[in-house]
């Protein structure tokens, strides 16, 4: 049995977890930074300072809750990219320091791969499987062939889906982060009132574009008085639009996988936007695949997914040097 202490500091969550190869989460700690809410978005310098301030205490708490000590660890892991470079440096250097002192391996984890592989902590998902990764920084279709081996089928040509949610929320006068607020207000809205553009829909391939939707919402905000009901209707119409785009793109992704002679049994939807229950229900209803979502708390950034990915990497004997440098940009599959 292997046990890993994992650190996640790629954006505005400071998180630590201890996970073992028996799929047990022995401890998990997470601190969400609230400072960014009043500023309308994540301020990188503030985020990295908060990581420096809180990371040590979260590690201490995790060790105590797990009833282990550092000598019981088989490795340390940290999200080392992609993400905000300041936070990546804080987390990576801390994990390296523990690895050096304990003379145990250090594993640099790709944040995107952690989102993809966490599903294998929860379910018996075998490679290959289809992935829709929708988060604050990324929006792409992948075929996960193995640990460290991925085929990218399509991606956003402009904003990520998470960015689109946040920018639309800002136009509507909602606070950051926008996704949960849009979902909440949409429940009181009419999703058929506004016909927003379904960009790329019915086109071949499975790339995305969300810039036209943002422009359409901006025009609505300028045209309407934006009563409380107007805001709710825009939120509902926006979510309805996004769901139709995703459904169209999923069908194309399956066709592309089949053209590569890859049989897909499982379809995994992951990343922060996968926490949206409206989108979950739409995909479950209309997609004829075994569709799997991580629980809400493992869709958003967390260290459990980093720890489990570290376990998967360790089992493949992919060990990183202590000279590994954090990568603010890091494509999947590029070890």
UniProtKB/Swiss-Prot annotation:
Cofactor(s) essential for the protein: Fe(2+)
UniProt keyword annotations, A-Z: Acyltransferase, Cytoplasm, Iron, Metal-binding, Transferase, tRNA processing
Pull one GO CC term from this UniProt entry: cytoplasm
Q: Which GO terms describe its biological process?
A: tRNA threonylcarbamoyladenosine modification
Question: EC number(s) for this protein?
Answer: 2.3.1.234
Q: Name one GO molecular function term.
A: N(6)-L-threonylcarbamoyladenine synthase activity
Residues annotated to bind substrate: 133-137, 166, 179, 276
Task: Please give the family membership noted in the entry.
Answer: Belongs to the KAE1 / TsaD family.
Function statement? Required for the formation of a threonylcarbamoyl group on adenosine at position 37 (t(6)A37) in tRNAs that read codons beginning with adenine. Is involved in the transfer of the threonylcarbamoyl moiety of threonylcarbamoyl-AMP (TC-AMP) to the N6 group of A37, together with TsaE and TsaB. TsaD likely plays a direct catalytic role in this reaction.
Supply the HAMAP family for this chain: TsaD
Identify this protein by name: tRNA N6-adenosine threonylcarbamoyltransferase
């Amino acid at each position: 049995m292997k046990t890993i202490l994992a650190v996640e500091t790629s954006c505005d969550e400071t998180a630590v977890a201890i996970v073992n190869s028996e799929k047990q989460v022995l401890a998990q700690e997470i601190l969400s930074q609230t400072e960014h809410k009043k500023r309308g978005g994540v301020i990188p310098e503030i985020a990295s300072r908060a990581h420096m301030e809180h990371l040590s205490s979260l590690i201490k708490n995790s060790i105590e809750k797990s009833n282990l000590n550092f000598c019981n660890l088989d490795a340390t892991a940290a999200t080392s990219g992609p993400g905000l470079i300041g936070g990546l440096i804080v987390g990576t250097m801390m994990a390296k320091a523990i690895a050096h002192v304990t003379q145990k391996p250090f594993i640099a984890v790709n944040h995107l791969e952690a989102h993809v592989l966490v599903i294998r902590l929860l379910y018996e998902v075998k490679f290959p499987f289809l992935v829709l990764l929708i988060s604050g920084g990324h929006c792409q279709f992948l075929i996960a062939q193995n640990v460290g081996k991925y085929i990218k089928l399509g991606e956003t040509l402009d904003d990520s889906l998470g960015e689109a949610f946040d920018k639309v929320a800002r136009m509507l006068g909602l606070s950051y982060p926008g996704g949960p607020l849009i979902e909440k207000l949409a429940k009181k809205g009419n999703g058929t009132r506004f016909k927003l553009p379904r960009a790329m829909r019915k086109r071949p391939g499975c790339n995305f574009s969300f810039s036209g939707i943002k422009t359409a919402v901006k025009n609505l905000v300028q045209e309407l008085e934006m009563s409380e009901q107007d805001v709710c209707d825009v939120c509902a119409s926006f979510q309805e639009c996004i769901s139709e785009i995703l459904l169209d793109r999923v069908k194309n992704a399956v066709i592309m996988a089949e053209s590569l002679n890859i049989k897909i049994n499982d379809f995994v939807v992951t990343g922060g936007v996968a926490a949206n229950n409206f989108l979950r229900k739409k995909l479950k209803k209309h997609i004829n695949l075994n569709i799997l979502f991580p629980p809400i708390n493992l869709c958003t950034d967390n260290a459990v997914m980093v720890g489990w990915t570290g376990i998967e990497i360790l089992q493949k004997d992919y060990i990183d040097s202590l000279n590994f440098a954090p990568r603010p940009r890091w494509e999947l599959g590029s070890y």
